[in-house]
Amino acid sequence: IIVTHLTHSCLRSVLEQIAAYGQVVFRLQQFIDEVMGHSSESMLPGSGSVPKKSTEAPFRTYQAFMWALYKYFISSKEELAEIEKCIINNDATITLAIVVDKLAPRLAQLKVLHKVFSTGVAEVPPDTRNVVRASHLLNTLYKAILEYDDVGEASEQTVSLLFSLWVETVRPYLQTVDEWIVHGHLWDGAREFIIQRNKNVPVNHRDFWYATYTLYSVSEKTENEEKMSDNASASSGSDQGPSSRQHTMVSFLKPVLKQIIMAGKSMQLLKNLQCAESTTCQAGARDAERKSLYTLFLESVQSRLRHGEDSTPQVLTEQQATKENLMKMQSIAERHLELDDVHDPLLAINFARMYLEQSDFHEKFAGGDVCVDRSSESVTCQTFELTLRSCLYPHIDKQYLDCCGNLMQTLKKDYRLVEYLQAMRNFFLMEGGDTMYDFYTSIFDKIREKETWQNVSFLNVQLQEAVGQRYPEDSSRLSISFENVDTAKKKLPVHILDGLTLSYKVPWPVDIVISLECQKIYNQVFLLLLQIKWAKYSLDVLLFGELVSTAEKPRLQEGLVREQDTVAQFGPQKEPVRQQIHRMFLLRVKLMHFVNSLHNYIMTRILHSTGLEFQHQVEEAKDLDQLIKIHYRYLSTIHDRCLLREKVSFVKEAIMKVLNLALMFADGWQAGLGTWRMESIEKMESDFKNCHMFLVTILNKAVCRGSFPHLESLALSLMAGMEQS
């Protein structure tokens, strides 16, 4: 080729411009060759190409990216071939300026590709793990699309190119997600997926749900890597970090990350439960006909794009109809922007257009006050995100609802989850009233008769006899143990029951929900109920005749003289014996009123009412994680409302003091009037009055503040007793 009409400097400037892009093509081609396994040694010095050992095959995300570049260069070479043919045929006058002008769009694309490649691949440090490389590349493409999408119509070709690259590169990720949420198998040989399986925990282990998967998260700003275990919430990464670190690993999966984790774990658990062995063949046949997540995504994207093309004339004809809506939306958007002191008509128009694309606009803004979340993903770049929202997320959501729903149904129907939850309430929270009454009264009677009751064999025999009559299937699962606790506490009658621990053997997989940690909370409530019921029982079984007969017995046997001696041995008394007996009757009634009020409050207002709410929530639970949270929240609620939290320990101490008074009073009543001194009765009355007044004051303040509305019934009940005193 001869270009006689150009000077050397002019030719040089044109060729330098082209050569720069040639260097870009060379670097990209070198990456393609390396991933394909060709010419891995012939790297340019300092080119910073993919630093991988030749023995280790490139992971699938890089292979997919390479394939996308390869297809791009095929079309690029075809275009160059057309220009070359045109020059060879000499059909028209061709100058270098014309050639450069024809290549301008392609050169602009190469510039974008080079930027993406440099950031996403070339600049990644050599010792970086695959999980970071893959997510960094996908994030780079994702952010580039959002960035160019922001420009609008001026960069449509660039967005189209980047989108096609991203769709091709994301294929392995979506295939991994599909395999996991459909088959319950997380296949990731190169360890490039952000969720990794911990193989040390088998599926049939009770910790499977909490400790099986690890979610890796990387801050794009600082490049600091973190490992976060998807603990009981299993939703790590769904709201991680402030807006400065919003582009954590694989931003595009962020809105559905929780659903992916839930669906994947649920499907793996379902597969291992083998609850539908008879339908295995049918499931295999259905799977053969099933379209993969990636295929569904592509079809949705194509139908959305086609819909966009088809509807263009329709949009033009409907412009008049939509103009009014647009103006209405614009005025609403302007009002909401003014809340943040933003006065920008153009921004308001764009917001209005954006909201018109969303069918839930009126639902979102119907509430009045609106809080715009500034940390949300690029609110000005809705087109690409709307594509994802409508083309990818619904397919993941559908699979999430299907497999989580199946798991919940299987657990409830085949593994009797609801029955086990009811069993915990029957025995630990004593909702199986008559059964548990038979058990604990046998212990209380032993204590009253001063006999040994701490023998584990005796306790278990009593438990088995009580439970076996009405709940034979649960008797083999229940056991009770006794451990000696602090001896200083044991001096107080109310703490003599400390150390009693009820155990219920929960089978797998129900033990994922009813864990040993949950049983510890159940046991704390169980012990409190035992203490209240013991105080109540001790007061209930006292007979008026017992106290009267012990006072009148000496008189009947030895006459009036002996009676005077008996009275004298009680010490100096200001009141006759009958008045003393009357005071004890009154004190007993006051103690009974207090204990019964407390007992009714906990058994009805707390356990029964909260239990009904819990049952309803269990029925509504969509996935196992939600159910675990509901169960834990239920336990946390009853734990708090039974005043077992450290923060309100002073209230519990006052209640324990009254229960202790009741037990000491019952013990003294049993011993007979002769063992009582007037000072003892007066001190007991004084202690009770002080505790009673303290509790009424504290509870009333809490109710007036509105912080503990559930305490209102207890406060009113105790106030009624206060008036009597």
Swiss-Prot record:
Keyword Transmembrane: no
Localization in the cell: Cytoplasm, Cytoskeleton, Microtubule organizing center, Centrosome
Pfam families in the cross-refs: GCP_C_terminal, GCP_N_terminal
GO cellular component: centrosome; cytoplasm; gamma-tubulin ring complex; microtubule; spindle pole
UniProt keyword annotations, A-Z: Cytoplasm, Cytoskeleton, Microtubule
Disordered, as annotated region: 222-246
GO biological process, one term: microtubule nucleation
Chain ranges passing through the membrane: none
GO molecular function: gamma-tubulin binding; microtubule binding; microtubule minus-end binding
Low complexity composition bias: residue spans: 232-244
Residue ranges the record marks as coiled coil: none
Role played: Component of the gamma-tubulin ring complex (gTuRC) which mediates microtubule nucleation. The gTuRC regulates the minus-end nucleation of alpha-beta tubulin heterodimers that grow into microtubule protafilaments, a critical step in centrosome duplication and spindle formation.
Entry similarity comment: Belongs to the TUBGCP family.
Oligomeric form and interacting partners: Component of the gamma-tubulin ring complex (gTuRC) consisting of TUBGCP2, TUBGCP3, TUBGCP4, TUBGCP5 and TUBGCP6 and gamma-tubulin TUBG1 or TUBG2. TUBGCP2, TUBGCP3, TUBGCP4, TUBGCP5 and TUBGCP6 assemble in a 5:5:2:1:1 stoichiometry; each is associated with a gamma-tubulin, thereby arranging 14 gamma-tubulins in a helical manner. Gamma-tubulin at the first position is blocked by TUBGCP3 at the last position, allowing 13 protafilaments to grow into a microtubule.
Name used for this protein in its record: Gamma-tubulin complex component 5
Record organism: Macaca fascicularis (Crab-eating macaque)
Lineage: Eukaryota, Metazoa, Chordata, Craniata, Vertebrata
